[in-house]
Amino acid sequence: MSNIIYDESITIDSTKTNRKTVDTSRNDYDNQDMVDKVDAVANIIMEGKKSKYRDVFFPELINSLDLKTGVEIGVDEAGFSSHILTKTKIEKYYCVDNWMDEFGSGINMRKSKFDTSGDVRYNNAVSLLSQFGDRAIPLRMSSMEAVTKFNDNSLDFVYIDGDHSLFGIYEDIKAWTHKVRIGGICAGHDYKDGSGSGINDNFGQQLPYRIKCVTDDYCRKHGYKLNTVGGLTLSWWFVKNKEA
């Protein structure tokens, strides 16, 4: 039996997760220097051929930067979550997903996406995560509900793989970037635009992914250096070197 219990009344004391504070008012504070240091670490990791894939790159980045507290949005059956927990020394990893029976996007747009029910997938995720004890915390709720449970600048790492629609990805990046501390890492999956399987309107037409254009625009607007790492589909990431 799983030792992870989901409590709908859960309140996260994320003040305890903020390990580091950076005094950005200091005259010698150098945002670009922070980015350059992380880039140097990333470049060393990327020297290995296999390290160009997210399953290798992100665990090595997390360990190299000594990141301790993270959130993953869009967990499904916790395959990537369990990989991160296995390969890193991360101390708290919050796994956020609605675990719904259907995927919905937009107004009056609803399409069955999953072969198994939300409850089955949730139970599978909890079972897999149970091996990590209190390092893994599944949160069965929407991304926008979960984000209210964390203080600004309280997280080291966030990985976004939830709502792939234009509005959904924009809301996720905007909201969760505020929760990552200065010097932390914001990242996500499926860095692309175009059709996304399983997302259909009422007429059976595929609704487009809009992750690339939204991520590009957000980073350009706020002055973040956007990076990508390979795999079956690209992942994106940037250092939060200043407030958005």
Feature annotation, model-predicted:
Residues 4-66:
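Class I SAM-dependent methyltransferase Rossmann-like catalytic core
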Residues 42, 55-244:
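S-adenosylmethionine/decaboxylated-SAM
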